Amino acid sequence: MITDLPKDLIEEILSRVSMTSMRVVRLTCKSWNTLSNSESFKKMHIGKVTSTREGESRVIMLIDYNLFLMSAVLMDDVDPSIEFKGKLSCLKEQVKISQVFHCEGLLLCILKDDTRIVVWNPYRQETRWIIPRYSHRPYVMNNIRYALGYENNKSGRSLKLLRFIDYCYTEKHICWHEIYDFDSDLWTTLDVTPHWYILSNWSCVQGVSLKGNTYWCAREENSDGYNHIICFDFTRERFGPLLPLPVNVIDNEYEYVTSSCVREGKIAALFQHNDSYPYELEIWITTKIEAEMVSWNKFLRIDIEPNNNIMVPFIYGGFFIDEEKKKVALGFDEEFGRKTFNIIGEDGYFREFDRITFNIIEEAGERAGVNCGSYVCSYVPSLVRIKKPAQGKRKRQSSLEKLRFDQNTWIFDSIYQATASQIRRRRPTR
């Protein structure tokens, strides 16, 4: 029997098990559960699961409220491939995830009903559940943004969660920014008076995590185009200045911009037209980026003649690139409800994957609504631990924070009541 083998040999055998199958290993027997949770085994196992073939990237996909692990290989001498590794199901209970945010191996998952948030390390199978102080109404879900970040201090890495809503009501810019500290287990309202708008969460457009901070595409308050990015610094707990994107969206007649993280601490920006002119896109990559400065370099431009019978897919929900191979894996094209995964490159290279996506959707079950588009991002497993709430008596919120919270809840309760009344008046009477 395998249990009679030496411990070192069992460790070597089990370390070859894929990340998505480790839950089965832990449930097999008590000794395997103990072994697989030891730090020595985790270091051995993560070394194997993070090793990849040349041109291979691990990818997390959000499809119809479920998360999946994929492998994408982008090579020059062979056709690219997309391999389904399995559904990520480390959570003890089945939940429906409407948004996901990736931060260095940790996943911030927003549930469908927006009543709970879970921060999750799929590799360590560690979670921390967080209850928002205030539950917003379903019709403003796309105006709520989330980000996970951290600051480095003497005791190590301190995780923080940013949650904010930008809402235009009767031509007024209403916002509420709050931050959750994992160490204190407290929410705090931030003093933010924005002169900008951050790109909304349509089709799961998310911020990009880089070195503990988060970057979003943004525009000036009285501007039409999203021509900037803006950084939230989790150490100083404040937004930086608007930083220029390399392409002026309006002047170059681009309608949409999407950002993504690139290996080695870079951000990529993808500019594209809408469906009316699907023949052109540009991708730029940062050469230097900090909270208050940025510089860019053009990575790839696709410009196809309309009579070639090839259209650049309109991309929803993220992308990732292989900088060396000059290839881009372009998330999902969801035209007419048909989800396809696309890879493009230099010299008109184009490859579309369809069947594998349909297989995933069939397994996923429930089809997502408007608050859950498809989303893709690169992923590297991490040994970072998620700190549990301190035991004992919880710290009390300050009187000033209680006042700020009461003021914001009164404002949004009033807005939602007025909006609900308007909706009722618009409904036809029978």
UniProtKB/Swiss-Prot annotation:
SMART domains: FBOX. CDD domains: F-box_AtFBW1-like. The keyword Repeat applies. Kelch repeats lie at residues 161-207, 312-363, 383-430. PROSITE patterns: FBOX. Residues 1-44 form the F-box domain. InterPro entries: F-box-assoc_dom_typ1, F-box-assoc_interact_dom, F-box-like_dom_sf, F-box_dom, Gal_Oxase/kelch_b-propeller, SCF_F-box_component. It holds the Pfam family F-box. Keywords: Kelch repeat, Repeat. Transmembrane segments: none annotated. It comes from the Eukaryota. This is F-box/kelch-repeat protein At4g33290.
